[in-house]
Amino acid sequence: MTLQVQSAISLKPFNTFGVDVQARLFAEAHSDDDVREALAYSVEHDVSLLVIGGGSNLLLSGDVQSLVLRMASRGIRIVHEDCLESIVEAEAGEPWHPFVQSCLELGLAGLENLSLIPGTVGAAPMQNIGAYGVEIKDVFHSLTALDRETGELREFSLEDCAFGYRDSVFKHQVARWLILRVRFKLSRVANLHLEYGPVRQRLDELGIDKPTPFDVSRAICAIRSEKLPDPAVLGNAGSFFKNPIIPAQLYATIKQQHPGVVGYPQDDGRVKLAAGWLIEQAGWKGYRDGDAGVHKLQSLVLVNYGQASGLQLLNLARRIQSDIVERFGVELEMEPNLY
């Protein structure tokens, strides 16, 4: 057995909230064989398996009695290419932003709007991560996952993944599928998405009227760095709540009471609201209770000022949820996975 299983390991370095909880058992998977060994170990020792990547979409409310398996596999390769596009495959443990930069350096466009998002390649499809008008589903080709029930590998197409807003089949069947590697369809001819105002504005400020994918990536990195705190400095998991999608009738009611609300009509007739706007209107921006708080510049981000526990952060999130329901009749859904 090559898998190294350790006991009583602090997970503080492995979650971006910096919550100091302990894993009963911990191991890192650098290969498919390591993953299979971890599954076998969990069965043999009758212990559940918790798979993590970069820990950037995770809120740990207490010590974890599972075998925590951190995906640490690395590798980026082009598996198909022609004059217009390439299919790039990356191992699940590849850090996301460096992967995006590697693709840009290869002259491949499509991922630039997803620059500086924390996490790993394997976690990206689970959430169907998205930013500035682009989601994973827009550049996704296929992925390979291990069926934890049978031990067999399965290939997933775009349709198989059932991608939705910050959603996929893997989020609902997390105990079954373990993503090993992901393939992306990227273009050699850039089709830039500049419809989000801040991106265009930043490019204008830089005097760039004919941007390249690299330019877009740099602009988005600058915007994100200003808007979102660095987890290495201030513990956080990025946007903590999903932007709610509500019935048009409820939106009309809110609009009547709060004329400043901005809604984004959806294809199904519903309207998407900015969760950050709701939270800010309710007075939570900059709120702090001990070391758990809401960021002073970005109300969508909960932060750990140092020694907050996962339970304290969770309780704060629930208080915000209750207040938003009471004020607006809107339910906010948390983005991070709770354990």
UniProtKB/Swiss-Prot annotation:
It catalyses: UDP-N-acetyl-alpha-D-muramate + NADP(+) = UDP-N-acetyl-3-O-(1-carboxyvinyl)-alpha-D-glucosamine + NADPH + H(+). GO terms for biological process: cell division; cell wall organization; peptidoglycan biosynthetic process; regulation of cell shape. Keywords: Cell cycle, Cell division, Cell shape, Cell wall biogenesis/degradation, Cytoplasm, FAD, Flavoprotein, NADP, Oxidoreductase, Peptidoglycan synthesis. The keyword NADP applies. GO terms for cellular component: cytosol. InterPro entries: FAD-bd_PCMH (IPR016166), FAD-bd_PCMH-like_sf (IPR036318), FAD-bd_PCMH_sub1 (IPR016167), FAD-bd_PCMH_sub2 (IPR016169), MurB (IPR003170), MurB_C (IPR011601), MurB_C_sf (IPR036635), Oxid_FAD_bind_N (IPR006094). Its EC number is 1.3.1.98. It holds the Pfam family FAD_binding_4. The active site is at residues 166, 239, 335. Its cofactor is FAD. Belongs to the MurB family. This is UDP-N-acetylenolpyruvoylglucosamine reductase. It comes from Pseudomonas savastanoi pv. phaseolicola (strain 1448A / Race 6) (Pseudomonas syringae pv. phaseolicola (strain 1448A / Race 6)). The gene is murB.
